[in-house]
């Protein structure tokens, strides 16, 4: 039982009609009672993050957001194996600094895009065993790129068709606290097609294809050689129907 004050704040300054500057600061607090009940008493994870950035228009219908951030966290839980047994402990201080870039909007009347890129420099700063190591499951590079094309009316009666395709990926990540091995980076491709029947209540059939090349990849590690790695979703196809009321 108890309470914790977690302040946060931000400010936005509109430099011009097309350019906004912003800054945010926030403290974080996360109890670790769910795992502490099994592994023993663990202190809560606490941290503070700072972010500055700008939102602006690149061209008519195309906007971008660029942000710089730094985040410090203490008491970050990690697992390790000692004499065949898995234990959970906490690192003294973990720092992550990076940049995020997002671009979205219309390239033409028919073609639109969403693109993102992130760079993260993360390191364990204070820990008797792992100081200077790369934190588990934190990629240095992440990114995605997706295009959507609107064919407009197809098949008559006002019926419309949209298709899209893109890719998402991440760079290599530390698989264990000692950095003895790394999960390899990956890029997977996705696609979709949506056909809308113009009726009294428009009906849309949409086919979503995930990992269309059926690439084997790993999304994360438990951080312990005893427990292994999480394999990414294989190829899947999902057809959905929706009605607009």
How should each PLM-predicted stretch be described?
Residues 15-18, 58-60, 74, 107-109, ...:
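Short coil turns and loop connectors of transmembrane beta-barrels in diderm outer membranes
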Residues 1-16, 37:
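Signature of Gram-negative outer-membrane beta-barrel scaffolds
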Residues 14, 20-26, 44-106, 114-118, ...:
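Membrane-embedded beta-barrel scaffold of Gram-negative outer-membrane proteins
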Residues 12-15, 44, 54-56, 105-109, ...:
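Residue-level signature of outer-membrane beta-barrel architecture
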Residues 23, 50-51, 136-245:
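Conserved C-terminal beta-signal and adjacent last beta-strands/turns
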Residues 70-72, 90-176:
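Gram-negative outer-membrane beta-barrel transporters
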Residues 32-40, 76-84, 120-132, 173-181, ...:
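Outer-membrane beta-barrel translocator domains and adjoining extracellular loop/strand segments
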């Amino acid at each position: 039982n108890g309470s914790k004050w977690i302040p946060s704040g931000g400010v936005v300054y509109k430099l011009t009609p097309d350019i906004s500057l912003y800054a945010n600061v926030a403290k974080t607090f996360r109890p670790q009672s769910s795992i502490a009940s099994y592994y023993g008493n663990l202190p809560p994870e606490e941290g503070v993050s700072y972010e500055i950035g700008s939102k602006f228009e690149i061209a008519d219908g195309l906007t971008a957001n660029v942000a710089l951030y730094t985040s410090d966290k203490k008491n970050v839980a990690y697992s390790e194996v000692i004499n065949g047994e898995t234990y959970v402990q906490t690192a003294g201080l973990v720092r992550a600094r990076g940049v995020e870039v997002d671009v979205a909007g219309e390239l033409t009347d028919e073609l639109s895009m969403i693109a993102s890129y992130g760079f993260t420099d993360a390191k364990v700063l204070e820990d008797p065993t792992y100081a200077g190591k790369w934190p588990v499951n934190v990629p240095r590079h992440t990114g995605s790129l997706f295009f959507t094309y609107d064919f407009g009316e197809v098949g008559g009666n006002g019926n419309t068709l949209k298709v899209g395709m893109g890719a998402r990926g991440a760079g290599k990540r530390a698989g264990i606290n000692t950095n003895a091995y790394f999960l390899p980076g990956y890029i997977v491709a996705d696609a979709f097609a949506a056909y809308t029947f113009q009726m009294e209540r428009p009906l849309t059939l949409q086919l979503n294809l995930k990992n269309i090349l059926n690439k084997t990849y790993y999304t994360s590690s438990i951080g312990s050689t005893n427990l292994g790695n999480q394999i990414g979703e294989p190829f899947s196809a999902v057809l959905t129907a929706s009605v607009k009321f």
